[in-house]
Each structure stands twice: as structure tokens, then as C-alpha cells.
Amino acid sequence: KKIENGQIAITGKTDEGTLELEYADSIGTRKPVTIWNTVSHSASEHGSTFIKNILAARKFAYPKSVYAVHDSIRFVTKDKLNALIVDFFAGSGTTMHAVNLLNAEDGGHRRCIMVTNNEVSADEAKMLKDKGYQPGDAEWEKLGIAHYVTWPRTVCSIKGQDVNGNPLKGDYLGSEPPMHMADGF
């Protein structure tokens, strides 16, 4: 009854399907806890595996879970549907992916500016130098993080397909109604 009359708001859903509720007059005043022990925040399952499914053989060390970033951004922009998020270390593009997911869920128009360099890993740098390439050469730059991981992940998640053009498999967790990854954003 309190949900129906607006005293209590549904603010989310746990991995197990339990609704997260808050008194409407306290929304935006609650501080986050320092540890979120949530299955969907697993970097190996919803970071590394996610990247592998989108980017095939391309590698990125330690990507964050899209859901951990999504929940963090949602916490501070829940009532700011036109927020501008700036990610100064864009890495694998998780922040942009999370912003797009959040906008798709709540109809927001948040924007995300990604900033990153185009460095290559130490192993790739050695291999490229052994072949006579230097930073700035086309062969070097195409293996840099921005060109090889960040941008392709962003494009693939928006289009709903992997780097080979195949539809992404599965649904995004916690979305009601279910959002199919293959539908893109």
C-alpha cells in the first residue's frame, strides 16, 4: 500500500530478485556502504567473461563488472537523468557500457566522456619493437587499448553484437523487463 501511495519507492532489485525499497523522502540522502558483496559485482564473471564474449580473443587485464559500475553510477545519478559522467581511465569501456545500460533501464539521457591513452601491453610492445614498429606506427596503434578494446567494446555493446558480428548472448541481470544483450542500446 505504501508503494502504491508513493511513500516507499522501489529503487532496485538484488541478484536473487528481492526488491530494494526506500522511503521516498529519504531517496538521495542515503550514503553507500563501503563493501558491496554482490554476486553481480564479480570481476571475473561479469568483467573478464563479459569482455571475452564481446571481444573474442582480445585480452584486457582486470576489467570491472559492468554491474558494479552500473550500481555505483545509479547510486549517485538516480535522480539525475541528464548527468555527465567523465571516465579519465576508460580502460575496457565499462563505464560507458554501464551508463548505456542505466539509460536503457530508466529512460535517462546520461552522457559519458571516455578518456584513455592508446598504450599497448608490455608483451605487445616487445613483440612490436622486435618487428621494428614504434609508437605511432599503424601496426602499433591498432593494438593499443583505445583502438583494440575500449572503442570496439563500446560499439559492440551498442549494436548488440560481438566483434565478429554475431548477436551477443544472454540478458542483462536485474533488468525488468529482461533486456537482451543482442538488442543493443
Question: Where are the regions a protein language model picked out?
Answer:
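Conserved S-adenosyl-L-methionine
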Residues: 62, 66-160
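Short mixed-charge
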Residues: 158-183
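Non-catalytic alpha-helical coupling and interface elements of nucleotide-dependent molecular machines
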Residues: 4-8, 155-163
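Class I S-adenosyl-L-methionine
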Residues: 1-84, 106-109, 119-125
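Sequence-level motif detector for i,i+2 pairs with an aromatic at +2
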Residues: 31-33, 182-185
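Residue-level detector of alpha-helical recognition elements and their boundaries
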Residues: 14, 110, 127, 165, ...
